[in-house]
Structures are given as C-alpha cells and as structure tokens.
Amino acid sequence: IGDALKEPAQSLAESAAKLNAPEGKQLANQADVLVRLVDEIQLANMLADDSWKSETELFSVQDLIDEVVPSVLPAIKRKGLQLLINNHLKAHDMRRGDRDALRRILLLLMQYAVTSTQLGKITLEVDQDESSEDRLTFRILDTGEGVSIHEMDNLHFPFINQTQNDRYGKADPLAFWLSDQLARKLGGHLNIKTRDGLGTRYSVHIKMLAADPEVEEEEERLLDDVCVMVDVTSAEIRNIVTRQL
C-alpha cells in the first residue's frame, strides 16, 4: 500500500515543482510533505510488524554528517539560526552498522529541532562512550522553547498529540517514535530532556562497531610541527577548530 501511495504522491510533487507561480512552490512543498509522510508511515508499519531489516555497511560518521547537514541547512538559514557540528571522533573514524537508519534518525530529530527553535542555534555533538568504543552518542541540542509533555507522549504513541509548528509547517509527529525504534534496532535508544523556554536535548545512544585498525585510513599529518594561533571569539567554535587542528 505504501508503494502504491508513494508513486502518485511523488508524481504530484514533481509536477508541482515545475509550476512557476508562487502557488506552485507552496503546492510542491505540501506534496513533498505528503511523500515524506507516506514513506514514514510505511517505515513505521515495517518496524511495528518486525519486517524491517537492518543493512550493515562500513562508513565514515563524518561523511554521514556531511550528507545530513545540506538537507536541513536551508531551513536553518531561512530562520536565521546557527548550526554547530562538534564531532569528537577521529577525523577518519569508520564504523560498521546501518548507515541509512542512523541518517534517518539524525535527519528526523534535526528537522524537529529546527521547527521548534525560533532563535539561537542547533548543535550536533558526537561522542564515543568511555565504557565501550563500539557505543556512540549523538546529541542534538536546540535553544527553542522546549518540547511539551504532550509532545513527549509521541515518543511512545505517535500521533497521539499535536506537535508545535512554525510559519513553515508543523513538527513531524512520527519523528520521536521512529527515531527511538530505529535506535533500538541499532542496540540503543532515544532520550529526550527539555526545559521550558531553554531548549531541548535529544540524545541518541547506539552501537556501531569500530572498524578494524587495518581498515582505518592513516591520518595525514600535514600540520605536524606547525604552530597555529587561533583567534576565535566563540568558545564553542574555538574548541572545535583547535581539536580539528
């Protein structure tokens, strides 16, 4: 059923995108939302009936982040928000796991964070747990108004309550449930902490096997024995630049 609905929805989105009038752009955006919703409902059904299958591959976490960011950057820019990426993993860190599942999780939560944030910034942090090199934590922090208790219920029962919205649309009611279910398929879970008026922290804990040492690429030591003076006002950005150097 999902495929049968997705095809006409995609056709509608493609046709609407060809219209030059302002109404055509609005129609195209609504059609894109419909396509995404059909795809997410199909995924939700597969997760619910346990027919979803994980696909393991070797991939770079940083490359995955570089793929996700362009998908959310236009929405971040049009709202005048800042985006910070703070990846504490090694530059060429390689992992074995379901790349597409992790991509979906990050995209869903970052899109939700953008919708619920009117001023400030969105931060994505990546850490390797001290207890095990195979366990990773992805944190998405926003400076929005916070997620309500009613919205939090969607983590366990999708569509049970309304989500907040901005001038561009509503936050995805399936985002929390799908992210948590996919994280559990990856050996972890989603944790959400929020403070009214201060923002929300989404913590995704997953298991991603580290690549064998012989598989990892040798880091280029281009800056060995080079002294660099960093003059950056923002402490967060200064720490990121210093660590990368």
What are these regions (language model features)?
Residues K121-E133:
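Short beta-strand/loop element within the Bergerat-fold HATPase_c
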Residues N86, I149-H150, F157, Q164, ...:
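Disordered, acidic interdomain junction associated with two-component signaling
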Residues E57-F59, K77, Q82-D93, D129, ...:
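Conserved catalytic submotifs in the C-terminal HATPase_c
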Residues L186-K193:
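Glycine-rich ATP-binding loops of the HATPase_c
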Residues S11, I41-T56, K121:
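Helix-loop junction within the histidine kinase core
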Residues S179-A183:
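Detector for a conserved hydrophobic position within an alpha-helical segment of the HATPase_c
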Residues D49-F59, D63-L64, M94-R96:
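Short flexible loop/turn segments at helix-to-beta-strand junctions
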